């Protein structure tokens, strides 16, 4: 009998991560950096500047990959992350679709 590896259901669950990033994150290439990391992770969504100087990141894909993006946004600066992140507020929800690739607005 052959054992078939079953993927972790939670890791494969399609989710939406909405993250609001505070700090010096506008005018420094931060959205372009987010887009590059999201595409590397196979995520879809958008990164956009908000009037209050935050950047909103909406990403959809497997929960595990979205969690990796959140760690890149909020963790110790690496991968040449531009600007300065003072804090990140995140919200998880069910993926809604509607994105084609990952854009910056």
UniProtKB/Swiss-Prot annotation:
Residues covered by the Acylphosphatase-like domain: 16-105
Entries under SUPFAM superfamilies matching the protein: Acylphosphatase/BLUF domain-like (SSF54975)
Superkingdom assignment: Bacteria
Active site: 31, 49
Key words, A-Z: Hydrolase
PROSITE patterns assigned: ACYLPHOSPHATASE_1 (PS00150), ACYLPHOSPHATASE_3 (PS51160)
Keyword Hydrolase recorded: yes
EC numbers for this chain: 3.6.1.7
UniProt KW Transmembrane keyword: no
InterPro entries, per the entry: Acylphosphatase (IPR020456), Acylphosphatase-like_dom (IPR001792), Acylphosphatase-like_dom_sf (IPR036046), Acylphosphatase_CS (IPR017968)
Reaction catalysis annotation: an acyl phosphate + H2O = a carboxylate + phosphate + H(+)
Name of one Pfam family that matches: Acylphosphatase
Coiled coil regions in record: none
Molecular function GO labels: acylphosphatase activity
Family, similarity comment: Belongs to the acylphosphatase family.
Protein's UniProt name: Acylphosphatase
Species the sequence originates in: Acidothermus cellulolyticus (strain ATCC 43068 / DSM 8971 / 11B)
Underlying gene: acyP
